[in-house]
């Protein structure tokens, strides 16, 4: 029996879904705590051993991003939680990078909408959130910075609901799960009056509320490429999501371009996102 067969189940609509994977995008306005939250998730999920040092602000690695405090090129981070691989996909937050936003969101099945417990939803949040709704992503709201003395989490939750109504969200989306966090203090809670603890309630809610990806493991290979890189050592690197079939080292594949042209290529190497980097694997499947 293949790994794909043992890690799938049929949902209520008859779709075959992976049960051991969650693909989530994080949507947030500048300074609402996205980088701090991801740092916290990585620390507490066991990516690093206790004696390891970790540079903060993991997602803001591009020089321009460090200078301006924004995210332009999305990064992917993978972590394991209770036997499930959680792929975290960071999203550009500005309308200027709309093409990048759409490509990134198509990698995800759900989105964490991160909102400051004092400021509430901001214009930057609105743009990416609208794109996420258009992609049909399952939504989960995270009200962050509840450790602030001036926080107003209940009002901000209501503002978030109103924003979703304005954007035309359906009834299912409006019944979104939500949780409160302090990324700086490292905890999540279902009750904003309850301070302290750890981030585990957030990770548990992700596994419970965000669906695994719909897959077709026995169909011919289909891989949606979302970004291309060039390495002087291995050549062109395509990053994307496998919707159907399998991809193996040494496999001959057809590369379909946007204009309909088709070229043949050989897969020299297959890698998966693994914690903060990538690891080689002989095969990957939908």
Task: Place the predicted regions along the sequence by residue.
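P-loop NTPase switch module centered on the Walker A-proximal segment
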Residues: 2-115, 119-121, 159, 228-231
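Short beta-alpha junctions and helix-cap segments that line functional grooves
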Residues: 11-12, 61, 75-76, 98-101, ...
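Conserved nucleotide-binding/hydrolysis micro-motifs of P-loop NTPases
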Residues: 32, 44, 94-95, 118-121, ...
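Alpha-helical scaffold segments in soluble metabolic enzymes
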Residues: 36, 40, 103, 127, ...
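N-terminal, positively charged nucleic-acid-binding surface of large information/translation enzymes
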Residues: 63-78, 128, 134, 174-189
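Conserved C-terminal guanine-recognition region of P-loop GTPase G domains, centered on the G4
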Residues: 105, 110-173
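Conserved catalytic-core segments of large NTP-driven translation/proteostasis enzymes
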Residues: 165-286
């Amino acid at each position: 029996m293949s790994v794909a067969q043992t890690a799938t189940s049929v949902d209520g609509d008859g779709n075959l879904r992976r049960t051991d994977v969650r693909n989530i995008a994080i949507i947030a306005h500048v300074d609402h705590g996205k980088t701090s939250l991801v740092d916290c998730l990585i620390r507490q999920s066991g990516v690093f051993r206790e004696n390891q040092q970790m540079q903060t602000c993991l997602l803001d690695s591009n020089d321009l991003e460090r200078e301006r405090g924004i995210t332009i090129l999305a990064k992917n981070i993978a972590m394991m939680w209770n036997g499930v691989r959680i792929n975290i996909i960071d999203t550009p937050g500005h309308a200027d990078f709309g093409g990048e936003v759409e490509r990134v969101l198509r990698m995800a099945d759900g989105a964490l909408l991160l909102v400051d417990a004092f400021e509430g939803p901001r214009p930057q949040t609105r743009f990416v959130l609208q794109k996420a709704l258009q992609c049909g992503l399952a939504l989960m709201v995270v009200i962050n910075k509840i450790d602030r003395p001036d926080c107003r989490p209940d009002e901000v939750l209501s503002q978030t609901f109103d924003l979703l109504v304005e954007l035309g969200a359906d009834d299912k989306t409006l019944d979104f799960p939500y949780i409160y966090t302090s990324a700086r203090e490292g905890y999540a809670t279902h009750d904003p009056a309850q301070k302290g603890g750890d981030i585990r309630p957030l990770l548990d809610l992700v596994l419970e509320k965000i669906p695994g990806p719909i897959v077709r493991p026995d169909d011919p290979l289909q891989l949606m490429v979302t970004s291309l890189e060039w390495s002087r050592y291995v050549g062109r690197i395509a990053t994307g999501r496998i919707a159907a079939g399998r991809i193996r080292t040494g496999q001959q594949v057809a590369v379909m371009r946007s204009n309909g042209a088709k070229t043949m290529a050989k897969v020299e190497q297959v890698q998966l996102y693994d914690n903060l980097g990538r690891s080689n694997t002989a095969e990957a499947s939908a």
